[in-house]
């Protein structure tokens, strides 16, 4: 809520507020001008201009708006104009500290249909996806009753804001962190949500789950990006994240101990996430900080297929150790 103490100018056909000072519930100040024209308070139209400085500009819980919820403190301008049939919001803001926003574009009732890390029958998965022809984002405009609302947000996102992108509300996969970039958000009571712009993740974590057995927080590397091109479901992600641990290199093969100065070595489990939010591709890799190039070359000789890399990642994340395959290591040793 907002409060003000100032003069209201009234006449027979209009109500006016002229550059008054308003205060949000946290005591932050802004300036508002309003012109409300009417004919006996019917056939009305209005124009509101807002100049805010670190003010509470958005505050919605998940029930009010399940797609975009949280609190936004921002500085900038907003214009609201309309009548009894149509109301337009044009907002140009820069995020400020204490902003915490949640983006959830997955339908909780059908989130598993878009689970991109799962072991299921592909034909069954395709049938399930086809059966969800009703776009989950239509929740924005469930009714056509009342005045139509059209909203256009131009946002300058700064690292002050905490942003959480929910990938899978059932499994708990989510990207949480701080970002920078420019973002345009358009939606209304009779139109689908559209988003445009590039967001660069400055720091954050990817809460990764696999079959709801593994739950690990991967640290997102600087330079990871999310590009919005309209439909949020088709946002393009390029995420690189790591999970640090220490493991016994001898569990992979005893011969590797000859190249390593110690038994337990630092290991980075690397997760690469690329593609559309709806169904990104995921791949894994391993890095060995503080180890020499020859040791890494020898390790990659044992782990030379995608299946073996995935198996090693699962073992490292679940058991904190390398997977040992005697037949496989024997063949690899013979080749070397």
Q: What does each model-found stretch correspond to?
A:
Residues 1-324, 336:
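Strand-loop-strand
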């Amino acid at each position: 809520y907002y409060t003000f103490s100032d003069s209201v100018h009234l006449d027979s056909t209009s109500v006016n507020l002229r550059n008054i000072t308003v205060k949000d519930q946290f005591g932050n100040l802004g300036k508002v001008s309003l012109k409300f024209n009417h004919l006996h308070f019917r056939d009305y139209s209005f124009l509101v201009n807002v100049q805010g400085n670190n003010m509470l500009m958005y505050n919605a819980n998940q029930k009010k708006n399940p797609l975009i919820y949280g609190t936004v403190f921002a500085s900038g301008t907003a214009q609201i104009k309309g009548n009894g049939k149509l109301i337009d919001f044009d907002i140009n803001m820069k995020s400020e500290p204490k902003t915490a926003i949640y983006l959830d574009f997955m339908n909780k009732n059908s989130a598993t249909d878009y689970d991109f890390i799962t072991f299921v029958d592909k034909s069954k998965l395709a049938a399930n996806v086809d059966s969800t022809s009703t776009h989950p984002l239509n929740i924005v405009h469930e009714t056509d009753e009342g005045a139509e609302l059209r909203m256009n947000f131009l946002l300058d996102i700064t690292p002050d804001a905490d942003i959480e992108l929910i990938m899978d509300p059932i499994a708990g996969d989510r990207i949480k962190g701080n970002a920078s970039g420019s973002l345009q958000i358009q939606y209304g009571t009779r139109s689908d949500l559209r988003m445009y712009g590039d967001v660069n993740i400055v720091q954050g974590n990817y809460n990764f789950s696999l079959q709801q057995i593994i739950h690990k927080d991967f640290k997102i590397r600087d330079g990871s990006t999310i590009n919005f091109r309209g439909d949020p479901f088709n946002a393009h992600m390029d995420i690189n994240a790591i999970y640090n641990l220490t493991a016994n290199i001898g569990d992979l093969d005893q011969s590797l101990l000859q190249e390593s100065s110690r038994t337990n070595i630092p290991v980075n489990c690397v997760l690469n996430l690329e593609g559309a939010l709806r169904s990104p591709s995921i791949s894994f890799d391993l890095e060995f900080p503080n180890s020499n190039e020859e040791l890494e070359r020898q390790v990659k000789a044992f782990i030379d297929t995608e299946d073996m890399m995935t198996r090693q990642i699962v073992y490292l994340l679940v058991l904190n150790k390398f997977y040992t395959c005697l037949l496989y290591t024997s063949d690899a040793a013979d080749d070397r």
